[in-house]
């Protein structure tokens, strides 16, 4: 309990410092709080970049391994124990951690809980941002403008999920990923409807940041893997060519 309270208090103090800094530049609470939330989100997401790289790299590598995994599943479908051993052996050979993407999710939940406490503790009742009339309030059916942020939150959750998980060559894997993304988006839409606008704003900005970040990381990781693949192919071609040259020399001597 002490550790949780300490984390919550740390986030409150950190956000308060950011808000004071923003307020000195933009002395209007209807802008400073919203801008402070956006800046806080960018800082948190920047600190989590190493974990995001690990998650996305793991996804790209797992996707690249799908053809080989399929072959193993077909070859050893009658021997589950052997299949598991060979699968783990393949992961080890390719330096792939199948659970490499889980750490980011585990880290994000305590942060989300701490921010819930932050926005609950702050006196932001009546303070708005852009079209948001009150950052402390949840969405209501009576005011359609409060629907916008939860809907955007759900939509960006779905798009972020698509970009974070590179397209798979396996139709079953694609279907599973799509179903998971839709389910997560609906869940986050429901959560966004029941949380304060301040927390939903954090999650939405976090998704937008993640989308841009994922695009950059996937492009870089894919290019690196392609370069490594081409390098291996070039090395194989050189070796084959050297072998052929040696054979030709022997034949000429004969």
From Swiss-Prot:
Pfam families per the UniProt record, alphabetical: 60KD_IMP
Keyword Disulfide bond: no
GO molecular-function term, one example from the UniProt record: membrane insertase activity
Locations listed in the record: Cell membrane
Transmembrane segments: 33-53, 99-119, 147-167, 182-202
Domain of life: Bacteria
Membrane topology: Multi-pass membrane protein
GO CC terms, sorted: plasma membrane
Positions with biased composition (Polar residues): 233-243
The keyword Chaperone is annotated on this UniProt entry: yes
UniProt GO BP: protein insertion into membrane; protein transport
InterPro entries in the record: YidC/ALB3/OXA1/COX18, YidC/Oxa/ALB_C, YidC_ALB_C
Keywords: Cell membrane, Chaperone, Membrane, Protein transport, Transmembrane, Transmembrane helix, Transport
Region Disordered, residue ranges: 233-254
Record's subunit section: Interacts with the Sec translocase complex via SecD. Specifically interacts with transmembrane segments of nascent integral membrane proteins during membrane integration.
Protein purpose: Required for the insertion and/or proper folding and/or complex formation of integral membrane proteins into the membrane. Involved in integration of membrane proteins that insert both dependently and independently of the Sec translocase complex, as well as at least some lipoproteins. Aids folding of multispanning membrane proteins.
UniProt similarity note: Belongs to the OXA1/ALB3/YidC family. Type 1 subfamily.
Entries under NCBIfam families matching the protein: yidC_oxa1_cterm
Listed name of the protein: Membrane protein insertase YidC
Organism: Clostridium acetobutylicum (strain ATCC 824 / DSM 792 / JCM 1419 / IAM 19013 / LMG 5710 / NBRC 13948 / NRRL B-527 / VKM B-1787 / 2291 / W)
């Amino acid at each position: 309990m002490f550790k949780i309270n300490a984390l919550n208090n740390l986030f409150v103090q950190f956000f308060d410092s950011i808000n004071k800094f923003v307020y000195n530049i933009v002395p209007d609470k209807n802008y400073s709080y919203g801008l402070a939330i956006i800046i806080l989100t960018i800082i948190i997401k920047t600190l989590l970049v190493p974990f995001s790289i690990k998650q996305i790299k793991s996804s790209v590598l797992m996707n690249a391994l799908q053809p080989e995994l399929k072959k193993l599943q077909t070859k050893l479908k009658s021997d589950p124990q052997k299949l598991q051993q060979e699968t783990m052996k393949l992961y080890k050979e390719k330096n792939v951690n199948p659970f490499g993407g889980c750490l980011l999710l585990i880290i994000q939940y305590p942060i989300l809980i701490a921010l819930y406490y932050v926005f609950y503790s702050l006196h932001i009742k009546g303070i708005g941002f852009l079209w948001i009339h009150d950052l402390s309030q949840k969405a209501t059916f009576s005011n359609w403008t409060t629907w916008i942020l939860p809907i955007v939150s759900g939509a960006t959750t779905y798009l972020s999920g698509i970009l974070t998980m590179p397209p798979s060559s396996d139709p079953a894997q694609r279907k599973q990923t799509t179903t998971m993304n839709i389910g997560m988006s609906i869940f986050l839409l429901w959560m966004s409807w029941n949380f304060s606008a301040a927390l939903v704003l954090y999650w939405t900005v976090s998704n937008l940041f993640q989308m841009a970040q994922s695009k950059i990381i996937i492009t870089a990781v894919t290019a690196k893997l392609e370069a490594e693949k081409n390098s291996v192919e070039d090395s194989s071609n050189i070796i084959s060519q050297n072998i052929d040259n040696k054979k030709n020399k022997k034949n000429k001597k004969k």
